[in-house]
Amino acid sequence: MDSINEFTSKKLSIEGNISSGKTDVLNILRNINNVVSFHDVEDRYTPIEKELIRKFHENPSRWSYALQTHYCMKRVRMHLECFVPSRVNILERSIFSDRYVFAEAATALGYMDDPEWALYCKQHDWYTDKLEIQFDGIIYLRTIPESCKERINEKSITEKNYPNISIDYLKTLHEKHELWLTQCKKVPVLIIDGEEDFIFDPCAKKKLINEVTEFINSI
């Protein structure tokens, strides 16, 4: 099955670790009829964000709160601006992964202290409550940290100044993804094996499209 009910209006997010393959999957899913995808690239390479990310990985305790606050606002803006009526809208990450994965990981690793965490949560709760931010479903691209690190190392060769992200940080992010999405009760979650080669394996690509299509039609 690769057809979605016509005039379906839904909003989903695709979640996963850094370099888990979300962008490649989104490029494939946008070929499904009635699907429109929004990539997390609008600000990624602006000078301000590149500098903020660089500073975070050099000194996470100093810059974690600033980075998480920036991304919280960015997710809110994506939620408000990236929506096409009567279409299935799939966003790369959400304000919820910003909190339950990245902000919680930063706190667990000691990058944000208790006052910063409290301020972040207060801001996050205000946005989600006042703006009534909700999603119809989540697609979780489950990729082991070692694979993510290998892909990051490859990117660091081709992209100048690509941040050196530690395997320990990736493992913590993976643990937070697992804790959040394997126990999530508020919204349906589809878990996809991120170790599959969706680019060069036609069978894996077809399976991905079928699973996502069936998931969207079921919610």
Swiss-Prot record:
Tell me the disulfide pairings in this chain.
Answer: none
Which catalysed reactions does the entry list for this protein? Answer: 2'-deoxycytidine + a ribonucleoside 5'-triphosphate = dCMP + a ribonucleoside 5'-diphosphate + H(+)
Task: Give the EC number.
Answer: 2.7.1.74
- Descriptive protein name: Probable deoxycytidine kinase FPV059
GO terms assigned for molecular function = ATP binding; deoxycytidine kinase activity
The record lists substrate as bound by D40, Q68, R93, D98
At which positions is ATP bound?
G16, N17, I18, S19, S20, G21, K22, T23, D24
Q: Which Pfam families match?
A: dNK
What are the catalytic residues? E92 (proton acceptor)
Alphabetized, the UniProt keywords read: ATP-binding, Kinase, Nucleotide-binding, Transferase
Q: Which family does it belong to?
A: Belongs to the DCK/DGK family.
